[in-house]
């Protein structure tokens, strides 16, 4: 009888893949064995395969991702009669980590049905439920998760041991008799009664609840109750930053415009927050000045039960102090969230690691924040990087996330936040140690941002010194370039690409602050071809939060000082101009982000101070009309001059048309310069990256101006600094080889 050795690679551990193989094999009368190992899943089988190999890919379980099915003839004299799943142990241990997944339809039907899990908030199976958020160490089994304290009852044990059951080896398996417990507490005491019903009643009464979710606590309130929303804003001291919402699918159509692509994203097992056009049926204070709302579907049984009992739409925003990481522990929540929440919906299953909600857009598709449900999935490295050494890269100061390279794959870590916040810095250090231990990573090089004062850069330098391995400092926008190429699997020797990088800031090799760049390069190096005409950042970092400073210098440069004086009468203009003239705490910057701030300030959008990062630019995007003037921005000696945009203001153009002009003119100017490189044969393709390209209007316009060119964009990896570490790691790998 012919025997075969079948190797399956991808996300195939912890997703019910072995029982799936067992069922396929038994249905086809095959004999053999299936097991997990360090490379994925290994199948040793004898008999007529027929469509068996194709079915492994085509009929895989919902959470599986099959990257490769490799079939080779083999001699398998020791195969058992029938088909077996290898017992747990070194061979059978699950060594890959799967992201957390939203409740599957079968489990949802159970909690709404009449069986033993009716109304049970911790129902899960191999197709859904917690994974990364409960994992404490590898291999992945119950004893190494936060489910270890909960001994299985006989009924759960029987399901766990039955290969025909969808809970076969589901490590978080639980039921009301043996699993975690849910309760509501207020005033330091647990309240008697149905926790879900009590919580829903309090939400209907306008109270704010702290709700323990999958990767941390949320603060929840009735999204239709303007007083409750205002109270939450006052308590959190969060005057304008948009709140995320949670809604059942049947409630979506009345609050947002749901496209087929948005619905698909909402239903994805990652269950991200999806940005969609608002219908105007909810209080404007949910997202002041924004045309979109961020909405997610319930993604745990607890959320489904709560939304069913409440019967409406909830605000579901991170449970944290302003700027601090999301709270994950019960005692921590009682200590830190009591000033915000009237009551706590809590449980006794511990959260092993903090995971924020992921955030996506769908038009065009892009990940804005990569976290719960999307990590820790691995990414294949582009051709040419197969033998890259183990590298750790630490990203930047904002939207921090680290990246590991190992065995031809990259593992981009979860969103951590801004590293200038002390608690976020602690979380960063914990994540560094956590990932190194969890994935047995032993770096042979360390990559950091070129800016030596970034906390992550200093940390990386210290670690490289301790390990005695090379430290590779990567220019900020070169890292963005490489991250975009890497996501698109651009070969290491695939030729140079014209890359438009528009973002907030990054230290340039010339000592100025970059942020509006056209680069020509690859993983190994780059040259700067065009850039936004630099302007001083008056007050340094203060220019990032006070848009009038950027407006003042741009208006002055356009010969419109009188207009600046009229627009900003209360600002210390004379002092600011003196600092700019003398170059005192006023570094030159080509930042596109600060140009958006400047135009927004001129239009009266938070001119004196932004209440959160990106507020001015986001509100400007929402304001922009669909049509309007598109003034040409001259490019002289590589410097693109935005002065004509400010002339529109002086001419009295409508604010929405000025906002349109900024997007269209900036897109047109950089697209024209990129096109020249393509037409001259200097570049093989054009790429768009940097945080400004998370502005869907800017991204779409730039793509339209380059419609007949090969365009590389980022969809699965954040174009903002959340993807920076991947680019750093790839640049480091390329430089190590070339050296």
Swiss-Prot record:
Gene that this sequence comes from: hypF
Record field: catalytic activity: C-terminal L-cysteinyl-[HypE protein] + carbamoyl phosphate + ATP + H2O = C-terminal S-carboxamide-L-cysteinyl-[HypE protein] + AMP + phosphate + diphosphate + H(+)
Functional summary from the UniProt entry: Involved in the maturation of [NiFe] hydrogenases. Along with HypE, it catalyzes the synthesis of the CN ligands of the active site iron of [NiFe]-hydrogenases. HypF functions as a carbamoyl transferase using carbamoylphosphate as a substrate and transferring the carboxamido moiety in an ATP-dependent reaction to the thiolate of the C-terminal cysteine of HypE yielding a protein-S-carboxamide.
Domain Acylphosphatase-like per the UniProt entry, residue ranges: 3-87
PROSITE patterns with a match to the protein in the record: ACYLPHOSPHATASE_1, ACYLPHOSPHATASE_3, YRDC
SUPFAM superfamilies for the chain: Acylphosphatase/BLUF domain-like, YrdC/RibB
Major enzyme class: ligase
Protein name stated in the entry: Carbamoyltransferase HypF
């Amino acid at each position: 009888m012919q025997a075969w050795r079948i190797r399956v690679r991808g996300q195939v551990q912890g997703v019910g893949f072995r029982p799936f193989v067992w069922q396929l094999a038994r249905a086809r009368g095959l004999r053999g064995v299936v097991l997990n190992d360090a490379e994925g899943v290994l199948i040793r089988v004898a008999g007529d395969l027929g469509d068996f190999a194709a079915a492994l890919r085509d009929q895989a379980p919902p959470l599986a991702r099959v990257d490769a099915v490799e079939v080779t003839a083999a001699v398998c004299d020791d195969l058992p009669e029938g088909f077996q799943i290898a017992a747990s142990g070194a061979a059978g241990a699950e060594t890959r980590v799967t992201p957390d997944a939203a409740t599957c339809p079968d489990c949802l039907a159970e909690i709404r049905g009449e069986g033993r899990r009716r109304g049970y908030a911790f129902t899960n199976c191999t197709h859904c439920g917690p994974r990364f958020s409960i994992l404490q160490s590898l291999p992945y089994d119950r004893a190494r998760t936060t489910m270890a304290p909960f001994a299985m009852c006989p009924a759960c044990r029987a399901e766990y041991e039955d290969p025909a059951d969808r809970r076969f080896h589901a490590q978080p398996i639980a039921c009301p008799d043996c699993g975690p417990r849910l309760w509501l507490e207020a005033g330091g005491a647990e309240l008697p009664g149905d926790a879900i019903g009590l919580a829903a009643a309090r939400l209907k009464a306008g109270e704010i609840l702290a709700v323990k979710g999958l990767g941390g606590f949320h603060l929840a309130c009735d999204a239709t109750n303007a007083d409750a929303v205002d109270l939450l804003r006052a308590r959190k001291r969060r005057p304008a930053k948009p709140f995320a919402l949670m809604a059942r699918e049947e409630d979506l159509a009345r609050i947002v415009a749901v496209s087929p692509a948005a619905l698909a994203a909402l239903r994805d097992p990652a269950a991200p927050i999806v940005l969609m056009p608002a219908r105007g049926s909810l209080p404007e204070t949910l997202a002041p000045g924004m045309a979109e709302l961020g909405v997610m579907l319930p993604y745990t049984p607890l959320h489904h039960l709560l939304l069913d009992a409440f019967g409406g739409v909830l605000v579901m925003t991170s449970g944290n102090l302003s700027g601090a990481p999301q709270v994950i522990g019960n005692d921590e929540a009682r200590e830190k969230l009591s000033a915000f929440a009237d009551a706590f919906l809590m449980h006794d299953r511990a959260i092993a690691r903090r995971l924020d909600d992921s955030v996506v857009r769908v038009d065009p598709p892009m990940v804005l924040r990569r976290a719960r449900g999307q990590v820790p999935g691995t990414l294949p490295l582009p051709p040419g990087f197969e033998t890259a050494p183990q590298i750790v890269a630490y990203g930047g100061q904002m939207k921090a996330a680290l990246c590991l390279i190992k065995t031809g794959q990259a593992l981009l870590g979860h969103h951590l936040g801004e590293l200038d916040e002390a608690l976020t810095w602690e979380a960063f250090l914990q994540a560094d140690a956590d990932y190194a231990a969890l994935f047995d990573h032993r770096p042979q090089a360390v990559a950091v941002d070129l800016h030596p004062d970034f906390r992550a850069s200093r940390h990386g330098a210290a670690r490289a010194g301790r390990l005695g391995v090379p430290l590779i400092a990567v220019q900020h926008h070169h890292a963005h370039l490489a991250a975009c190429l890497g996501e698109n699997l651009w070969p290491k020797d695939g030729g140079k690409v014209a890359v438009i990088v528009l973002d907030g800031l990054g230290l340039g090799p010339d000592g100025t602050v970059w942020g509006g760049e056209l680069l020509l390069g690859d993983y190994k190096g780059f040259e700067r071809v065009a850039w936004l005409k630099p302007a001083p950042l008056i007050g340094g970092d203060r220019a990032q939060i006070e848009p009038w400073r950027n407006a003042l210098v741009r208006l002055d440069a356009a010969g419109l000082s009188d207009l600046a004086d009229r627009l900003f009468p209360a600002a210390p203009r004379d002092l600011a101009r003196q600092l700019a003239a003398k170059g005192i705490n006023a570094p030159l910057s080509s930042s596109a982000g600060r140009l958006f701030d400047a135009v927004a300030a001129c239009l009266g959008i938070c001119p004196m101070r932004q209440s959160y990062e990106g507020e001015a630019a986001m509100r400007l995007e929402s304001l922009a009309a669909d049509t309007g003037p598109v003034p040409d921005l001259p490019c002289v000696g590589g410097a693109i001059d935005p002065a004509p945009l400010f002339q529109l203001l002086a001419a009295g153009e409508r604010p929405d048309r000025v906002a349109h002009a900024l997007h269209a003119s900036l897109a047109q100017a950089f697209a024209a310069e990129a096109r020249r490189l393509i037409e001259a044969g200097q570049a093989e393709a054009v790429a768009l990256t940097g945080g400004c390209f998370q502005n869907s209007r800017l991204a779409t316009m730039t793509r339209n101006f380059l419609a007949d060119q090969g365009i590389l964009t980022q969809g699965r990896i954040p174009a903002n600094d959340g993807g920076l570490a991947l680019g750093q790691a790839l640049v480091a790998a390329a430089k190590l080889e070339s050296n």
